[in-house]
């Protein structure tokens, strides 16, 4: 009797229609290609190239044409076809010809974009171990303007401000009466906010570490998340609006300068886990209640509720997050002459980022999955991303918005396409839960922190570990890569702040 095969599942049917591996023919006709800069600043003459050329081969050819061969620049390539931009993922054949998008006799105009106009060197060694905290370090963040200033929050009820150049503490910021759960620099680096399990938010001078004004006390349970208003949206008086998320199920919007509560955003039915303030003046909040809410920052009204997760949502990341965090500061060593000058530069950077990749949102959950959203266009997911075997603790868009890195309790880091959500790679090397990951400013490198006491630096292009960084004596909860690319900071249960450099 013949064996009857079970019917294909929906997933198997989908995979059969979209095979993950496509055989690329060794011989394929030459095609007519013209390279054009994505900003229309340069257009090269047409030439013939093999229709099965890989992205790396196109990159090498373009560098040769642009006379960059001595110091080659990595590029992304895209094809504009019928009012749609198709990114060249691996090679021309799979992206353009295999699916019949175009024919070999067609003329192809390939838009090229440098992945970054400067390069960040991988951190390779611990250059400082700074002691002072008497409790577990659970949060760490570099100043948006310089890698010489770092703030950390700890279970010893204090935050500390560090000088990373001299490897010494500047100040111990005392005032909280419970764990400091989150820290946040204003995007112009003019003020530091700290949130605590004592239900309060405090503010500090970033030069001396001295307190600024009284604590904000309207939350009734611990503060879990802080996020400043983006610099390009700030009024002439300065960047003084802050969003806070709490275990009391609310998000609150504050005028920090006046010490007034502007709005209480009520609607979540369980504790808030993460808050993001987008560049379109929308506020995004995630919660134990399995939902993400979108709020209008102008009036505090709930605009949308994003549903799709089956368990609590742990973390959110925006594709524009890097430029929102760093404001006007970039690789050009920009020195603003005034606040309006600073705000103008921040707006230019944001609009350039928005033009390149839009403003998408990714959410990470206890249900082992991620969801990619385009909230400005729809409340329905772009896609759901499966693969992690345990809780997904953290998600982070690369600065260029093209890639998403996720950290999970399954001991792995995964990479996903930032536009489609397509799975790209699993980065294995950690032997225990991975807590956080942080990108280099040029989007080429990634660092992850783990329960296994190590940091690991990954090369995103090769999808392999570049450096293993042991040194901590206990699990590492917090990691940050400075916006200028010079340093990585980490902290954890061994109470030490470690600085890593190249």
UniProtKB/Swiss-Prot annotation:
GO terms for cellular component: nucleolus; nucleus. It holds the Pfam family NLE. Coiled coil: none annotated. Its main location: nucleus. It is found in: Nucleus, Nucleolus. WD repeats lie at residues 132-172, 175-214, 218-264, 267-307, 344-383, 387-426, 429-468, 471-502. Keywords: Nucleus, Repeat, Ribosome biogenesis, WD repeat. GO terms for biological process: ribosomal large subunit assembly. It comes from the Eukaryota. InterPro entries: G-protein_beta_WD-40_rep, Gprotein_B, NLE, WD40/YVTN_repeat-like_dom_sf, WD40_repeat_CS, WD40_repeat_dom_sf, WD40_rpt. SUPFAM superfamilies: Nucleoporin domain, WD40 repeat-like. Residues 28-116 are annotated as: Ubiquitin-like (UBL) domain. Associates with the pre-60S ribosomal particle. Interacts (via WD repeats) with uL18 (rpl501/rpl502). Interacts (via UBL domain) with mdn1 (via VWFA/MIDAS domain). Interacts (via WD repeats) with nsa2. Belongs to the NLE1/RSA4 family. Involved in ribosome biogenesis. Required for processing and efficient intra-nuclear transport of pre-60S ribosomal subunits. Interacts with the AAA-ATPase Midasin, which is essential for the ATP-dependent dissociation of a group of nonribosomal factors from the pre-60S particle. This is Ribosome assembly protein 4. It comes from Schizosaccharomyces pombe (strain 972 / ATCC 24843) (Fission yeast). The gene is rsa4.
